[in-house]
Amino acid sequence: MSAVAVFILFAICLVIAIPVSISLGIVAVLPGAFDPSFTASASYVIRSMLGGIDSFPLLAVPMFVLAGILMAHGKISQKLFDVFVYLIGKRTTGIPCAVIITCLFYGAISGSAPATVAAVGSMTIPLLIELGYKKDFATAIVAVAGGLGVIIPPSIPFIMYAMATGESVSDLFLAGVIPGLMIGALLMFYAYYHCRRYGEDKEKIDKKVTELREKGFLNILKESIWALISPVIVLGCIYAGIASPTEAAVISVFYALFVSLFIYKSIRVKEIWGIMVEAMKTYAPILFILAASTAFSRVLTLMQVPQTVSAWILAHFSNEIVLLIIINIFLLIVGMVMDTTPAILILSPILLPIVQSIGMNPIHFGVVMIVNLAIGFVTPPIGVNLFVASSLTDVPVMHIAKKAMPMIGYFLLALLLLTFIPAISLFLL
């Protein structure tokens, strides 16, 4: 069975709405079913699936999922937002910028874009609307800024990329810091332009910030400090050599539980089981996709698909700039129609040999790949962030996407800079 037939069948399965994990399992088994002499028999595929999820680094994923849900229920995003509003709320575009900075910080806790949108958006979008910002703008800015959750470390997609390629999770986390901050700064620049052009209700904003400032900075800082230092604790443990990324993920769970239960008292003991069930429901589909993607990628390797694709592309595109642009366009399209996890696990083994052949650093490519797929979070038809944000405000998905287009433009500008200036990603390594 040819590789082309495998991918066509996979596309058909997706079009007729067969779940991604089942689709991957089907196409992983078929080559061996059609050719009994092929190494990848059904038993091989099953062993590959079990082997794919039997990974210590992979344990970080459910832990970060659980930590993110604990922090969402624990109102930690509210504490982060309050301190940023206190500091910059009265400035032009101060409130939207506070939303973006909150997404940056929350992304450094949860490692997930949809979780960032849900946690930050549920609290900030109603406030933005109350302060006079249009509902579609408020929804769009949270949906796009939520994409920073997969770029700023710790990042679940970076863990997936490390699993698929064997690269260092810690190095990938470091490489995501400057790109995440740069994209956040570009989004704030757009928010400033938007607010200068369309105006703000300064009277409402000043009243709201004044109410907050009446508490006093020390009181606000006292309430927020536990939320502010959480990324420092998680990332500090990793880079100080105290803990591996997986161990740091476990630390983040216990830290979130401790702060929410005993400091902020925003969750009760009897709610913990429900939170764990929610985390399991969130992670279970990811686990099945991980297992099936691993088996499928190993079958593709046995079929020599990475080598064949690499040889064909390098034979037809000798110019490095053109090649990188084509890969970026391809990844952008993939991000629009496929979830991040299977995209990373399937495409990384295929594309990495190609970019390495032109001298591109694997860590640098990992950042470029994740930024491409982060844009997919806010582009139809899949656009998970769009659907999460839409569920918070009832604004139609396409309206949010239309309002998000200028911000996506800044995301694309950042992508070009990251692609052709490797030092942005590799500076901290």
Regions found by a protein language model. Name each.
Residues 1-429:
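Alpha-helical transmembrane segments of multi-pass membrane transport proteins
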